[in-house]
Amino acid sequence: KAAAKTHQKMTLLEKKRVSAIVLVSAFQIIFWMFWYLAYLPIYYHWAENMNWKVGGFTIPVTWFDSLNALLCVISGPLTALLWQKLAARPQGDISIFKKLGLGLAFLGIGYIYYAVIDIVRGDNKPTVLLLIIFFLFLTLGEMFFSPLGNAFIGQYSPSRLLAIMSAVWGLGLFAAAKLYGNVYAFAFSGKFAFSKACITIAVIAFVSTVILFAIDGKLMSLVKDKDEE
């Protein structure tokens, strides 16, 4: 009986939910590709074009590897409180797909911030403390995207396909990790101005946000069980 249950045909709702997961996984590739990419300018661009001394102390570049984790710990309870506030509104919470879109938007704002710093600095070396603001945008993007993306898989994946759908989500992470180095080599190798490369990435992130907002209704129709309404 267990074998028969495992191999039974998927229902229409399950097929729709699988389609939604695959579609959102494509946006996940974009998010994580640009998220991983965000660290490389620190090592190869800002390492030479920023003043890393604060009060006579030279801040190690590696400290910024840990800054995101610290900001996640700080912002985690704050974002949880935000979700509660939104859910308590008369009109209810915003959809998970719009939240994922906002995660991409925060990432795009971070790259715009990168570009603004580079344009405004001219030939000067601005203080490395400015990078803290960039990491704030990076972390906000992660807090909007990562936990909710995992929750999306757990909530809407057919139970007997949960492992496979989790693998599909993981495959998106794998693709992003493989691609971001190539994107950096293409966009930041000197072929384009640093600020223009950052703005282009930001535009892609913003367009992804607009698309997620535009297809929000369609995605909700794919995952919603009419019998539960």
Q: What positions do the PLM features span?
A:
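Transmembrane alpha-helices of Major Facilitator/SLC transporters
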Residues: 57-88, 103-111
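A late C-terminal transmembrane helix in Major Facilitator Superfamily
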Residues: 154-188
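C-terminal transmembrane helical hairpin of 12-TM major facilitator-type secondary transporters
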Residues: 97-145
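Transmembrane alpha-helical cores of Major Facilitator Superfamily
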Residues: 66, 70, 105, 136, ...
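Intracellular loop-helix junctions on the cytosolic face of multi-pass helical membrane proteins
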Residues: 1-57, 79, 83-89, 215-229
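Multi-pass alpha-helical transporter architecture, strongest
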Residues: 117, 200-229
